[in-house]
Each structure stands twice: as C-alpha cells, then as structure tokens.
C-alpha cells in the first residue's frame, strides 16, 4: 500500500516502513504524528484519488529525530567597490518513519 501526502506545499510518495526527511516539525523524537492531507491512496490494483483529499485517510508516522542539510554558501559581490558578503545556511529537517496508512 502507498499514499501520496502533502505537507506544507511539498508532496511525498510514502509506504509503511519508509524513512522520510521533511521540513522541520516541532515534535519530540519518539512521538507519533498524523499527516492528514492524503491526496491519493493505492494498493496495487485499486487507487483512490481525492478531490482534493481522500476522505478519512490518515498517514501515521513516528518522529526519529532532527538533522541538518548540507551547508549552502551565499556570496554577494559588487564589482569595483570592494563589496563582498559571504554567509552560510544549513536547513533543519525532521526524519520520520511511516508506521501505517489508514484509508
């Protein structure tokens, strides 16, 4: 069984047991969360497509922890003026494990 979920503007294809990295959630590691915006549910031969969401469908997941992405360097430069600015950014993510899909 698989589902396509929407979480804060991003869509993910998920299956039970899958480890997924999403944008940062305010949740403690080890806690259970529900992702309620399910757009599609399928199990091989049968597919339910929502308009826009599948009624009564919920994806439950366990929060594994937080991690940071790779460092992105932003460099601003203006020629002939000795103007240089270098900053870095590391996006924070939450890792979750999909425990079940209820449709």
Curated annotation (Swiss-Prot):
A single BP term in Gene Ontology:
translation
What keywords is this UniProt entry annotated with?
Answer: Ribonucleoprotein, Ribosomal protein, RNA-binding, rRNA-binding
Which is an annotated GO molecular function term of this record? rRNA binding
Source species, domain of life? Bacteria
- Xref: InterPro entries: bL21-like (IPR028909), bL21-like_sf (IPR036164), Ribosomal_bL21 (IPR001787), Ribosomal_bL21_CS (IPR018258)
Q: Which residues cross the membrane?
A: none
Give the matching Pfam families: Ribosomal_L21p (PF00829)
Quaternary structure, from the entry? Part of the 50S ribosomal subunit. Contacts protein L20.
Query: Which family, according to UniProt?
Result: Belongs to the bacterial ribosomal protein bL21 family.
Q: Relate the protein's function as given in its record.
A: This protein binds to 23S rRNA in the presence of protein L20.
What is the recorded name of this protein?
Answer: Large ribosomal subunit protein bL21
What organism is the protein native to?
Chloroflexus aggregans (strain MD-66 / DSM 9485)
